[in-house]
Amino acid sequence: GVQRRFNKIFTYKETNFYDDYAHHPTEIKEILNGIRSAYKKDEIICIFQPHRISRLKDLKKEFTLSFKKADTVILCPVYTAGEKIKLGFSYNDFAREIMKNSKVKLFIVKDKYQLAKFIKQTIYGKKIVVGMGAGTISSWMKELPKLL
C-alpha cells in the first residue's frame, strides 16, 4: 500500500492521472480532501473500484458520503477478492446513494476498455483524475495510456 499513495501515472490532454490505494471511506475522504486543497479550481474525477462486497455492505453509508470533494465519480465493477456476491446489496442503489450523499456526477463503467472510451470522449482540459482501490484498478491505470 505504501507504494500506491497518489502516484502520478501519466498526463493526457493536460489532465494528470494518479493512482492511490485508498479503498476505505476514511482514506478516500482524506485523499480527496488533500487533492481539493492542493487543486482548488481543478475538476477532480475519482475512478473508484470498490474492494469486497462485504466491506461495501458494512460501510455503505460511509462510502456514499466519502466522495464529497470530487466532482465526478466513475464507478468500476466491485473487485470481489474471491468473495461470493452477497444477497441484499444493490450496485445501482449504491451508485444512486453516492450521487445523492456526496453530490457528485457518477458514471458506471464495466471494464477498463469502457473506462478508456469514457475518458477519451469526456476528458479534456486541466483536470485531476485519481484511480482508487485495492484491486486491479492500479493495473488499469497503468494500461490506460495504451488504450487512449
Region locations from a protein language model:
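A glycine-rich beta-strand to alpha-helix segment
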Residues: 114-145
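Nucleotide phosphate-binding/pyrophosphate-handling subdomain across enzymes
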Residues: 1-72
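Short glycine-rich anion-binding loops that position phosphate/pyrophosphate groups of nucleotides
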Residues: 50-53, 78-81, 134-137
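Generic structural signal for residues in well-ordered beta-strands
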Residues: 6, 17, 106-107, 129
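Short amphipathic alpha-helical segments
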Residues: 30, 58-60, 86-87, 120, ...
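Short, solvent-exposed amphipathic alpha-helical segments in soluble enzyme
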Residues: 33-37, 61-65, 89-91, 125, ...
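C-terminal helical cap/extension that packs against the catalytic core
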Residues: 64-125
